Amino acid sequence: FMRPDVLISYLFPHVEMEWFIQGYAIFEILLGGGLLYYWLHRKGFSDFTSFACGFFYLSANCFFQAHRQIMFVNYLPFLLLAFLCLDRIFEHQEQDVYHIRPHIGLILSLFFCILHSFYFFPSCFLACILYISHLLPEHLKNVPARMQKKRKCKIWWNYIVDVSFAVSMNLFLLLPTGLSILGNKKDTGDSTSLLKILGVNPTLDSILYSPYGCGLTLFCLYALFLCIREKKTRKLAIAVFVLLFFDIFYWILNATLYVRPKCLIPFLPLILYLAAQALEGLRQKKIRHSLPLALLCAIPVIVQLIFLLHNQQIRHLVTADLVLLLVCASLGVFLEEKEITIPVSCWWINLGGLVLLLAIPSMLYLTKGQEEHYATIADESRDYFSREDLEACC
């Protein structure tokens, strides 16, 4: 009730609330895509790579929730702002001096993450930890060896201070919400079995296709595997893959309520950052294609086709996604072995590459949206209170 769209709506009592909620949701999706492009471009990625990953963001199936369960995705622009603030913190610190002090930009970014969706803040908090861990080694290279341990401790303490400020500023929301949850425990059915908690997710719907996960396509999983091979991105890529694959992390990040991959949506920006690393490396010939890794990506797709996906249109698109990846990986391996170089500066080659990368994600996004059965104004099945109850109270 303290979100910006809700507060602004109080100033316009004659405008229906649906316009504010829908307009703000669309604005946040577009803002997130723009911020992701800006973040990647600022980190030195090419226009091609930044645009492609920005489009991956906009076409991620998790944004299906922007009209249904808005708290699943409405914090993402502020998480991207937090990553931008972390970049600035590491860029502008003097190499011989580091003072522990609050970073206003990071505090405000995390504050709005909590304000929009406190349930997903533990995942946002962990995503920032992974990003800091990724940035630290490069930062410490410019710090004298005798000061590196002290500098590392100061950076982590500074992050804890910033998070503490953000949480404290949200206590007006967190305290009553926490007391309400404790005072009104909801029966969620049978408790989650230990076998399920300690299991794995062979479908990888935490990253692939599902609107209750990140909802990305197969190239992003392939890029994740390629980044595991590279020393610079290996630790971050392994950490992200472990979170995506092992059910116990779903359970922990869902506050031990259930084992569902929706808690991993906050890692979408990090996955796209790794996708940008892989795509840029492939275009610059710094990373080589791998047909075995492409074949490894086929396993979760086949499992999903057998057990999860029943819509024929989606099955065809997912199959096309797999075939396209295998063809591109095979062609890439062939060109590398023959030492044939494709000029990436040609506009028509870049255009063709964008079409190959973005066609399947956009079609999957539109097809997934067509599965929704939208509630009509006359449908009162979701109303907790009937119209008569509301009239009696008012």
Q: Language-model segments: what does each one mean?
A:
Residues 1-4, 154-265, 307-317, 383:
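Periplasmic/ER-lumenal interhelical loops and adjacent helix-loop junctions
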Residues 29-43, 47-93, 98-137, 158-178, ...:
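Membrane-embedded helix bundles of polyisoprenyl
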Residues 22-28, 72-75, 123-124, 206-215, ...:
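Alpha-helical transmembrane segments of polytopic membrane proteins
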Residues 236-245, 252-387:
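Contiguous transmembrane helix-bundle modules in multi-pass membrane proteins
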Residues 94-98, 138-155, 340-343:
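Membrane-interfacial, low-structure loops and terminal tails that flank and connect transmembrane helices
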Residues 390-394:
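Short periplasmic/luminal acceptor-recognition loop of GT-C membrane glycosyltransferases, typified by
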Residues 1-33, 55-77, 181-186, 194-210:
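Membrane-interface coil-to-helix junctions
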Residues 32-40, 78-90, 126-134, 220-224, ...:
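Transmembrane alpha-helical segments
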